[in-house]
Amino acid sequence: MVPSNLTIQQFDGTAWIGVVPFHMEGVMRRPLPDLPWVSAFPELNVRTYVERDGKAGVWFFSLDASNSLAVWAARRFFHLPYFHASMQVVAQGHGIDYRSRRKTGNAAFEGSYEPVSQPYASTPGTLEHWLTERYCLYAESSDGTIVRTDVHHRQWPLQKARAEIRRNTMLEPLGVSVTGEASLLHFSRRLDVVVWSPEPVGGTRPYLTSP
């Protein structure tokens, strides 16, 4: 699930998996223009937290999106495990109702969530800062090379959140069953991100690893 030459990070002895639903807007590659029917779409990713050569980043187990062109481009140019999904995002008051079902297989998510605090910046050394303030992602190319994509963003404007999760089978392809309430919930209204092109850092074919 994670390449053997990436280290799964732990916070106070615990490794974390995140399920992150959101909506993308303004996705474009300079100098191409922003085309709303191409560059705006829902996305849901399943991630864990890794490092290579001392550089902390994110490893995606899966990324689901409703835009088939975006799925193709992300697989082709960023080597990311994108999947095409049927998705619906509806604003409800201050919150969101979010539904996603992968076109193939049983991976699905349904839930409603909303913020319950004012926005704030996480404090260095805390779990929420460790989870959110990451500035690269790792992926594996078709020949087994590990690639790193650097990203830039301002610090996340986080809000505490509550959620009603009606269905979450996003981890079943990993052999993980999710029951009970989420261990940690956050909400963010908006974050602008700049993404660089992937760069090889060396690698091998993946092996199952555990922290």
What are the language-model segments listed below?
Residues 1-44:
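Glycine/small-residue-rich interface belts in oligomeric ring/scaffold proteins
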Residues 45-211:
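Internal, well-folded beta-alpha domain core
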